[in-house]
Amino acid sequence: NKKQIDGTIDECISLLDIAEKFRAFGWYAVTVKGDDIEAIQEAFKQVRENQSDKPGVLVLDGVKGSGVKCIEKMKFNHMIPVDKELADRCLAELEAVKNSL
């Protein structure tokens, strides 16, 4: 999700391409967008069908708070207190998304 408690992953300790690291150790690795349920399901199938005798891994590329912009945009959103104002803003965003479906 690109963040840890004290900042972004790239600011603290860049992991570079995680899937490529798994491949270097002989794993069958697939990276997929972490908030796309259909793509995740397809990627699971792809790993199962193609890993043969290798171990398989699915790397989800996600964003902490995805879909709730007021949380997603916060730099330090790993452990945040949620007061009534923030809860109301988040719920309003989620209701807007729900109503657009």
Regions found by a protein language model. Name each.
Residues N1-L101:
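Glycine-rich ThDP/TPP pyrophosphate-binding loop and its adjacent helix/strand module
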